[in-house]
Amino acid sequence: MFNVQFDIFNFSNNITFLTLLISLISYWLGLIFKKIKNVFYIGYGSTILACITITIILGTRWIESGYFPLSNLYESLMFLTWGLLFSAIYLEYKTNLYLIGAIVSPISLFIVSFSTLSLPQDMQKAAPLVPALKSNWLMMHVSVMMLSYSTLIIGSLLAILYLVLIKAQQKKHSLKDFAFANLEFTFPKSTNSTNFNLLETLDNLSYRTIGFGFPLLTIGIIAGAVWANEAWGTYWSWDPKETWALITWLVFAAYLHARITKSWTGERPAYLAALGFVVVWICYLGVNFLGKGLHSYGWLN
């Protein structure tokens, strides 16, 4: 049984890498060469296939280990990639905006490459859970946090892309210099189909995506506090991960506050979202490389 699962695991890893590479190439060929737009369908299909293979990887490990596969760095990286791909697939389906896949495929390929090629084999293997992780809160807290990271990352990437394009426009470079400049955004299932230009599209979609990810982040932090009280007798201990999770929450709370109450649009909230992109990665990966705190187990040791 183990050998069969191990073969499925390796095969799925290879297929995931290959499909993400095809997805990346397809999307960017479509953006650079406007006459071959049909290549976007190859990119989208490859993204779906990559998401399926990661599902197989995580499902196989779940069956093998007997617990939800979120106990070490490799598993969390793969789950984060799954969240990124699933979110991109859904958003692209709803909006027909292929730029989403074009910006998500590179970061997904990088994460998968790092997790499968850079991490030592010992860190990729499922290991027995430490006592503190033997709880139903493992799935509730960690999975929700990872899903919030994936949606917040996509929302932030869209905001960063918005800033790149607006700066190019301000420097008197027409957006027509970009291969994707003439894309229009349509709400396919809206009663009144509305077309927006590219910059308005990115600003609006970034706001909506972050608006979805922020409640997930809030729920994940609350679930983690409840779990911490059960495991260590305290809801909050100012662990490095907890501190940076709070900083992440505050950054995106400021973003949504500015959008909702101050009616900010355009560049100003985009800068906040770009800051959030950096903060999310510090919270997720940077803190763990310190090897300190309650969240260091199962990651680098």
Swiss-Prot record:
It is found in: Plastid, Chloroplast thylakoid membrane. The keyword Transmembrane helix applies. It is a multi-pass membrane protein. One of its GO terms (molecular function) is heme binding. It comes from the Eukaryota. One of its GO terms (biological process) is cytochrome complex assembly. GO terms for cellular component: chloroplast thylakoid membrane; plasma membrane. InterPro entries: Cyt_c_assembly (IPR002541), Cyt_c_biogenesis_CcsA (IPR017562), Cyt_c_biogenesis_CcsA/CcmC (IPR045062). The chain crosses the membrane at residues 13-33, 39-59, 73-93, 97-117, 146-166, 209-229, 236-256, 270-290. It holds the Pfam family Cytochrom_C_asm. Keywords: Chloroplast, Cytochrome c-type biogenesis, Membrane, Plastid, Thylakoid, Transmembrane, Transmembrane helix. The keyword ATP-binding does not apply. Its main location: plastid. Required during biogenesis of c-type cytochromes (cytochrome c6 and cytochrome f) at the step of heme attachment. NCBIfam families: cytochr_II_ccsB. May interact with Ccs1. Belongs to the CcmF/CycK/Ccl1/NrfE/CcsA family. HAMAP family: CytC_CcsA (MF_01391). This is Cytochrome c biogenesis protein CcsA. It comes from Guillardia theta (Cryptophyte). The gene is ccsA.
